[in-house]
């Protein structure tokens, strides 16, 4: 991040007002099409800076060092690269990408808020506490797929703190994006929340169970070792190390704001798969 004079770093009142309007419009769009807003409302306007570029390798990137989100120009209004396209004009897949990146920004915000940069760290958010517990006991040692196309060929890896945090962060963001995409798919063009239509809620649950059983909620990490990074830029987790069921329930409750009776029904639909090594640490879906 470029150094600049202190006075140049202070936004004008017009800048602040403009940022607040953009964020208010995003929240309003999300509410109108019945999408989750719980974690979005916890993000202060202006925390994340959104940019657009012609991205060729990835649909989006998030840079926590300067809280910057880079989206493909296709997610901008008229593909002009100046402002975010109205959410109602985005496809379900585009909204999946957007929510994935916005969740990265949310976790970044929680981490920054926790950091005692002024000597007085804010008490850790419950979701962040839960994340730290999961990082320690689920993402410290993982199974990976060295060859992505061969999902059954796996290897064990001991991850560094940086690698395990990225693996968790990406895995959780994959689920958040998936949850939003599939909510839009089951709601169709009815503009009615799936929580008010039992048939839609059941359809989402069926999709979730199928995705969970197929091991679709898997993140990745970038190896810290330079020699390994010369071989591959990303290591993808294997199905054995995908998102845990308890993690999904906590994210539904604390990040997405799903209704508790919906979460309880979904939990009851799963046969007991044994105790989670982290189930009693850091938080739960209340």
Question: Can you annotate each of these PLM segments?
Answer:
Residues 136-189:
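Metalloprotease/metallohydrolase-associated module, dominated by Zn2+-dependent proteases
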Residues 101-122, 172, 179-187:
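Catalytic Zn2+-binding segment of zinc metalloproteases
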Residues 14, 179, 183-286:
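Pan-zinc metallopeptidase signature
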Residues 13-21, 27-29, 88-97, 163-167, ...:
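Soluble non-cytosolic domains of exported or imported proteins
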Residues 15-78, 112-129:
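Auxiliary, metal-adjacent structural segments of Zn-dependent hydrolase domains
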Residues 74-99, 108, 160-164:
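Short pre-active-site segment immediately N-terminal to the catalytic Zn-binding motif
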Residues 109-155:
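Post-HEXXH active-site segment of zinc metalloproteases
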């Amino acid at each position: 991040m470029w150094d600049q004079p202190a006075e140049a770093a202070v936004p004008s009142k017009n800048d602040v007002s403009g940022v607040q309007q953009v964020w208010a419009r995003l929240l309003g769009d999300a509410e109108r099409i019945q999408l989750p807003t719980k974690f979005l409302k916890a993000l202060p306007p202006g925390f994340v800076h959104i940019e657009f570029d012609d991205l060729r390798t990835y649909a989006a990137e998030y840079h926590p060092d300067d809280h910057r989100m880079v989206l493909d120009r296709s997610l901008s209004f008229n593909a002009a690269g100046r402002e975010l396209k109205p959410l109602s004009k985005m496809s379900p897949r585009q909204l999946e990408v957007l929510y994935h990146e916005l969740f990265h920004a949310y976790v970044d915000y929680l981490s920054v808020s926790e950091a005692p940069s002024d000597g007085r760290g804010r008490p850790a958010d419950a979701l962040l506490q839960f994340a730290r517990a999961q990082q320690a006991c689920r993402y410290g040692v993982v199974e990976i797929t060295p060859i992505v196309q061969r999902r059954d060929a796996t290897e064990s890896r001991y991850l560094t703190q940086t690698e395990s945090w990225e693996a968790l962060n990406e895995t959780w963001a994959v689920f958040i994006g998936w949850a939003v995409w599939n909510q839009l798919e089951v709601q169709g063009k009815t503009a009615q929340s799936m929580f008010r239509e039992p048939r839609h809620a059941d359809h989402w649950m069926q999709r979730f169970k199928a995705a969970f059983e197929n091991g679709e909620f898997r993140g990745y990490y970038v190896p810290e070792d330079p020699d390994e990074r010369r071989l591959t830029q990303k290591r993808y987790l294997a199905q054995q190390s995908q998102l845990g069921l308890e993690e999904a329930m906590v994210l539904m409750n604390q990040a997405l704001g799903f209704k508790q009776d919906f979460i309880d029904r979904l939990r009851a639909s799963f046969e007991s798969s044994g105790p989670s090594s982290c189930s009693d640490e850091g938080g739960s879906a209340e």
